[in-house]
Amino acid sequence: MKRSAFFISDGTGITAETLGQSLLAQFENITFNKFTRPYIDSVEKARAMVQQINNAADKDDVRPIIFDTIVNQDIREILATSNGFMIDIFSTFLAPLEQELSSHSSYSVGKSHSIGHNSNYMERIEAVNFALDNDDGARTHYYDKADIILVGVSRCGKTPTCLYMAMQFGIRAANYPLTEDDMERLQLPPALKQHREKLFGLTIDPDRLTAIRHERKPNSRYSSYAQCEFEVREVESLFRRENIPNINSTHFSVEEISAKVLVEKGVERRFK
């Protein structure tokens, strides 16, 4: 079964898309054609949006699912004339909150993602720069400033996890790829020993690692199953020997890996 889904906002669309994606992910038996439409902030754009929704309804022969965070009442009323199933995120959650808090909400566009009034903005940028500067073991002499250091074989998900933690939570995350030389020594590299309390390991199923590496360097020793299986086995042995907490990243998203890492290490998010 296939349905169209629209994430519509008069701002960036981040809130509508994030919540909408999370809800749709619960329906694994349905394939969704997803469309994000930010900055629908005028009557003209709203009318054009209605036409897009109606076209999708005609094409699919079933009404699309609409997630919106539209603040302007006139625009919301126009969208409501479409042949879509509307889920007004703000109204759904703000009305009961207003009642509970005995206060009216501001209904401001882009409030949650404002840069000018967000004291976390510079901290976020600094964390991202730190993750980039300390990617792939590039600058180990700055590890004393890291909140956490991810270790594991090449291509097991360290870099995207570090960047996600930096972007979302302001975490200063570095990562270090364990190589064959490190495995042959049967101990942690010198650069990591003095920061043992910050280490967290990522491992991965060998067949998944083989597929990922094959996309980068096909038909090479680096991407062979034998090499991947050897590296994973040796790194997992090192984790056990050095008592490094770790998780298998194979079946988890970057968001899930990040959350598990922070909980396991007890690292507090700089902002939420």
Swiss-Prot record:
It is an enzyme of class 2 (transferase). Keywords: Kinase, Nucleotide-binding, Serine/threonine-protein kinase, Transferase. One of its GO terms (molecular function) is phosphotransferase activity, phosphate group as acceptor. It catalyses: [pyruvate, water dikinase] + ADP = [pyruvate, water dikinase]-phosphate + AMP + H(+); [pyruvate, water dikinase]-phosphate + phosphate + H(+) = [pyruvate, water dikinase] + diphosphate. The keyword Kinase applies. HAMAP family: PSRP. Belongs to the pyruvate, phosphate/water dikinase regulatory protein family. PSRP subfamily. Bifunctional serine/threonine kinase and phosphorylase involved in the regulation of the phosphoenolpyruvate synthase (PEPS) by catalyzing its phosphorylation/dephosphorylation. This is Putative phosphoenolpyruvate synthase regulatory protein.
